[in-house]
Amino acid sequence: MNSLNKTGLLYIVPTPIGNLSDITYRAVETLKNVNLIAAENIHHTNILLQHYNVKNILISLNKNNEKKQSDYVINELKKGKKIALVSDAGTPVINDPGYFLVKKCCFLNIKIIPLPGPCAAITALSASGISTNRFCYEGFLPSKKKIRRDLLKSLKKEIRTIIFYESKHRILESIKDIIETIDENRYLVIAREITKKWEYIYGAKANIILSWLKEDQSRYKKGEIVIIIDGFKELKNKDISAKAINTLTILRNFLSLKQSVFITSKIHKIKKNDLYQHAIKEKDK
């Protein structure tokens, strides 16, 4: 008999991200039938279990004790026990404790059964109106300003949709950093309190988002926020803004075409060749 048959099973069980109704029948049945539940926060998980009349043994597995508790869980799995891993909200391991446990299970060939379920990033993305074909998930934005800004700068020309989490305490600073490092005109969506009473999903250019948040503190003073940034798009000739065309036209009254194009490209961050092509087309009209 191989080691896979001797050991137990680790179930990765997603839990609601706000609305207690957002849990699958399979998830509830799994929580009822496993030998024990490894929870990020026992008190928080007990609220969910009581709601669904689930009675089971709970142990704590959080960011502070994850490495130590993973060893305990592994030993229990080796005895043939079935164990469920849950976080406070959403899918475990995704920005939540559980990585070390899952990694050890993979190394030891202990079977893992992941259940599908809630994830704030994916839920927000589905309703954002921003491309979902390709995206990168960056987790929580760094709390330190320089590290955060360096990360944002590195993503300025990322063509995929970008997803972040951010706290209510830093949302204004992070939006400011997006404006200053990426582009004030980049389209964003912010989704707060997904599935909860005060849920909202709002999309606009970055500078408008910042003004909108500042108008009413209640828009960001509670809950965590998902930030979704539209991917970088190269400006094509037809996409040259009216402001850029106006700048080029004014400069042409005083400077050569070469000088006018150079200055306009710097101001509006447009390729010089696109501006040349536009000027030539206008001349030929």
Curated annotation (Swiss-Prot):
**Top EC group:** transferase
The UniProt record lists the EC number as 2.1.1.198
Q: Name one GO molecular function term.
A: rRNA (cytosine-2'-O-)-methyltransferase activity
Q: Where in the cell is it found?
A: Cytoplasm
Q: Which Gene3D superfamilies match?
A: Cobalt-precorrin-4 Transmethylase, Domain 1, Methyltransferase, Cobalt-precorrin-4 Transmethylase, Domain 2
Question: What's the chief localization of this chain?
Answer: cytoplasm
| Record keyword S-adenosyl-L-methionine present | yes
Stored Pfam families = TP_methylase (PF00590)
Q: Known catalysed reaction(s)?
A: cytidine(1402) in 16S rRNA + S-adenosyl-L-methionine = 2'-O-methylcytidine(1402) in 16S rRNA + S-adenosyl-L-homocysteine + H(+)
> Record's SUPFAM superfamilies?
Tetrapyrrole methylase
Quote the cellular component terms of the Gene Ontology held in the record. cytoplasm
> Is Thylakoid among this UniProt entry's keywords?
no
UniProt keywords, alphabetically: Cytoplasm, Methyltransferase, rRNA processing, S-adenosyl-L-methionine, Transferase
UniProt-listed NCBIfam families = 16S rRNA (cytidine(1402)-2'-O)-methyltransferase
Q: Per the similarity annotation, which family is this? A: Belongs to the methyltransferase superfamily. RsmI family.
Q: What does this protein do?
A: Catalyzes the 2'-O-methylation of the ribose of cytidine 1402 (C1402) in 16S rRNA.
PANTHER family registered for this protein in UniProt = RIBOSOMAL RNA SMALL SUBUNIT METHYLTRANSFERASE I
Please identify the protein, giving its name as recorded. Answer: Ribosomal RNA small subunit methyltransferase I
